[in-house]
Amino acid sequence: MAPDNRIVVVPGSYDPVTLGHLDVITRAAKMYDEVIVAVVNHPLRKAKTLFAVEERCRFVEEATAHLENVRAQPFSNLIVDFARETGAMAIVKGLRAISDFEYEFEMNQLNRMQAPEIESIYLMSGPKYSFLRSSGVKELATFGGDIDDLVPPGVAKRLKEELQR
């Protein structure tokens, strides 16, 4: 029997949120009742984030304000535990390339060991976003490249400000 309220989480660092992320979030919002954009806040992560978790959540909230069933929320535990806490039935992830699939396949196996009741759903990136990574956006912005077609306007402005400091 399917749950009455179909909730999913879409996890990521979103440092910063890109139009590729927003494509996946928007598509998930059309398929599910509630989409929680789970913004990772993990102090032991190898790569430090450029923006604090609160600002990354705000970027997502601003970019998805037109989607009534989407909200951003920070998390700092296992994604399957966060999914359980929020009542999510599935974890939704975007896949860009074969390398994403290999990584996500391994993560899916670990997640299923921890929480077999939580499904993993994968949405393929469209060609327009198949190359897009937050790290690439930051690198482009660092060297003065044009990022206006890669991130929401508020994010582009804030990223340029942050990198000029």
Positions of predicted regions on the chain:
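Nucleotidyltransferase catalytic core that binds NTPs
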Residues: 1-165
